[in-house]
A protein has these predicted regions:
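Phosphate/ribose-phosphate-bearing ligand recognition and processing surfaces
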Residues: 138-166, 170, 177
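Short glycine-rich anion-binding loops that position phosphate/pyrophosphate groups of nucleotides
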Residues: 15, 43, 90-91, 114-117, ...
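Short, glycine-rich nucleotide/cofactor-binding loops
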Residues: 12-18, 123-125
Length: 278
């Protein structure tokens, strides 16, 4: 799918429509296209691919079944906002609404800019930012997820802190037409270094497959520990040089060109099980 040189851009996020990251992107993207914002009305971080499907039912027995079309519907409330539409829903709700219900149809969806990096294959089904981009890709609309590393950056974030990430994103959108990028790629996952660091170039990366979560029981309660963030804080990571996490720690802008999952792998063991069942 070739991107238009003057694209209609759908902008969403998971930090909420009043977050500084989406404001910075809105300002920067207006220079390269027409921007429509459809974003959650509050912080919806780490909700992954979840939808509000069924959440607004008036009772457990109200399935909102449309008998004529044999499809389920679920209202997703919204209010008007100075940037666009503030949706009482998830980032994926916003992507679906923006792609299918808002005119004109978007040429590209941009999700972000997230306060905090989204690195590694494991985050794709967890991060609301990346999930919105994936949702758009499943809806056959090119998309970009944009996040900024904030580890160790202890100031209250303002739109100005995201200006560098926003300008980089606008440059990518502006440079895409004529390249055939979205004929071969469904979406990009872009991660930008901390705002107090000048980017040390760009790196085309693959999402790291390293995943180290731990769980313990202390004083009768469960605790989760993300060892990956501990490693990043210590700048001691096991990832190879071609990965997104390595690039960001080196101060580079990480760009991962991705296709939507999921691929079918070795089917022979499954076939063996079926033969045993039959």
């Amino acid at each position: 799918m070739e991107l238009d040189s003057d694209p209609h851009i759908l902008l969403t996020n998971d930090d909420g429509i009043d977050a500084p990251g989406i404001r910075a992107l809105y300002d920067a993207l207006q220079a390269v296209g027409t921007v429509t914002v459809v974003a959650p009305d509050r912080n919806r971080s780490a909700v992954g691919r979840s939808l509000s499907y069924g959440r607004t039912r008036s009772s457990p027995d109200d399935l909102s079944l449309d008998l004529e079309s044999d499809s389920f519907t679920s209202p997703v409330p919204h209010t008007d906002h100075e940037l666009g539409y503030a949706v009482d829903g998830t980032p994926c709700d916003c992507a679906i609404v923006g792609v299918n219900a808002i005119e004109p149809d978007p040429d590209i969806v941009v999700s972000g800019c997230n306060a905090g990096a989204n690195l590694g294959a494991y985050v794709f089904s967890r991060s609301g930012t990346v999930s919105a981009a994936m949702e758009a890709a499943f809806l056959e609309t090119p998309s970009i997820a944009v996040s900024m590393d904030t580890l160790g950056y202890d100031t209250d974030l303002e739109p100005s802190d995201f200006e560098q990430a926003a300008e980089i994103t606008a440059t990518i959108v502006d440079g895409a037409p004529g390249t055939g990028l979205f004929d071969r790629v469904d979406y990009l996952n872009v991660n930008v270094p901390c705002p107090d660091r000048e980017p040390n170039g760009y790196a085309i990366t693959r999402p790291t497959r390293v995943y180290e979560m731990d769980a313990t029981v202390e004083d009768g309660g469960f605790q989760l520990t993300n060892k990956l963030w501990q490693q990043m804080a210590n700048r001691d990571i096991p990832d190879s040089e071609d990965t997104d996490r390595h690039a960001v720690l080196e101060g580079q802008v990480s760009i991962s060109p991705l296709r939507i999952p999921y691929e079918v792998v070795d089917t022979d063991p499954v076939r063996t099980i079926i033969e045993r069942i039959l």
